[in-house]
Amino acid sequence: MKSFKEQYTLDERLAESREIIAKYPTRIPVIAEKYCKTDLPAIEKKKFLVPRDMSVGQFIYILSARLHLSPGKALFVFVNNTLPQTAALMDSVYESYKDDDGFVYMCYSSEKTFG
């Protein structure tokens, strides 16, 4: 399965993120994709529009539900190979790690280490 960046050109992604932010200024565009070396399933919809004041932990909970993970199954998200604190707000993650195309890219895994 192609990554979001492989599916769309930079101009297409930039236009989409600008449109999203203009239409929903209190939300941020997030792309969540499976880490290639994890045994977790691929998520059907990669794009998320999350409230700026949502915590990373709340976002992980939503991802777990979308992936239909069993209650004890661990799920970790990485942004630029970094494990953000679960208490961090998505807005601060976005401002620190947003891509040139206006999206923030998160990679999910069942392992706490990346690489």
Swiss-Prot record:
SUPFAM superfamilies to which the protein is assigned, alphabetical: Ubiquitin-like
Intrachain S-S bonds: none
Pfam entry (one): ATG8
Keyword Membrane: yes
Entry's Gene Ontology BP terms: autophagy; protein transport
Lipid moiety-binding residues (Phosphatidylethanolamine amidated glycine): 115
MF terms (GO), sorted A to Z: Atg8 activating enzyme activity; Atg8-family ligase activity; protein-phosphatidylethanolamide deconjugating activity
GO CC terms of this entry: autophagosome; autophagosome membrane; cytoplasmic vesicle; microtubule
PTM field: Gly-115 forms then a thioester bond with the 'Cys-558' of ATG7 (E1-like activating enzyme) before being transferred to the 'Cys-258' of ATG3 (the specific E2 conjugating enzyme), in order to be finally amidated with phosphatidylethanolamine. This lipid modification anchors ATG8 to autophagosomes.
Subcellular location: Cytoplasmic vesicle, Autophagosome membrane; Vacuole membrane; Cytoplasm, Cytoskeleton
Bilayer topology: Lipid-anchor
Expression tissues: Constitutively expressed.
Keywords: Autophagy, Cytoplasm, Cytoplasmic vesicle, Cytoskeleton, Lipoprotein, Membrane, Microtubule, Protein transport, Transport, Ubl conjugation pathway, Vacuole
Family: Belongs to the ATG8 family.
Described function: Ubiquitin-like modifier involved in autophagosomes formation. May mediate the delivery of the autophagosomes to the vacuole via the microtubule cytoskeleton.
Database matches in PANTHER family: MICROTUBULE-ASSOCIATED PROTEINS 1A/1B LIGHT CHAIN 3-RELATED (PTHR10969)
Oligomeric form and interacting partners: Interacts with ATG4. Interacts with NBR1.
Protein name (record): Autophagy-related protein 8i
